[in-house]
């Protein structure tokens, strides 16, 4: 789906004010409530907006140790490795990649000892041939999407004549 300027404006407002209601969102965006409702439904239906939930600080929740783990997978075993990774609570996310490894995982642990147990559990799985890990010291750029959306190609909004562009 190609996003237009109104879509991006709504996503920016939702990111800046995650608990905002539709009425306030429409006021800040300068469009009718029905327009906001329709746009939000379209963004959800197309998979652009995948959910609304809290952003959890893992360190504050008791998981201050994070690492990125690169896995080399045995030929033809990606599906079963994927199932194994999904079953491990310490694995936050995993991506199939190019390069020297096949899968890149982000894991969270309570301590270095806990991290070591997670790594041992990964290495014990038959479909994983080798793993290498790097421990996160600090986050220098947190997960974000708005810079990509606001600096990417966008077309003008298709909107009702009452819409006033804030520019």
Regions found by a protein language model. Name each.
Residues 1-167:
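A compositional/biophysical signature of low hydrophobicity enriched in polar/charged and small residues
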């Amino acid at each position: 789906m190609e996003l237009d300027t109104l879509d991006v404006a709504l996503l920016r407002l939702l990111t800046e004010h995650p608990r905002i209601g539709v009425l306030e969102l429409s006021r800040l965006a300068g469009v009718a409530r029905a327009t906001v409702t329709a746009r939000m439904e379209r963004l959800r239906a197309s998979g652009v907006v995948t959910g609304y939930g809290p952003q959890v600080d893992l360190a504050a929740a008791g998981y201050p140790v994070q690492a990125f783990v690169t896995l080399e997978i045995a030929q033809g075993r990606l599906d079963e490795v994927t199932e194994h990774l999904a079953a491990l609570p310490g694995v936050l996310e995993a991506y199939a990649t190019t390069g020297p490894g096949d899968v890149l995982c982000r894991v969270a642990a309570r301590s270095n000892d806990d991290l070591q147990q997670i790594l041992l559990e990964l290495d014990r799985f038959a479909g994983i041939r080798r793993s290498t890990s790097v421990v996160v010291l600090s986050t220098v750029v947190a997960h974000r999407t708005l810079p990509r959306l606001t600096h990417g190609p966008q077309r003008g909004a298709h909107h009702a004549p009452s819409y006033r562009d804030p520019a």
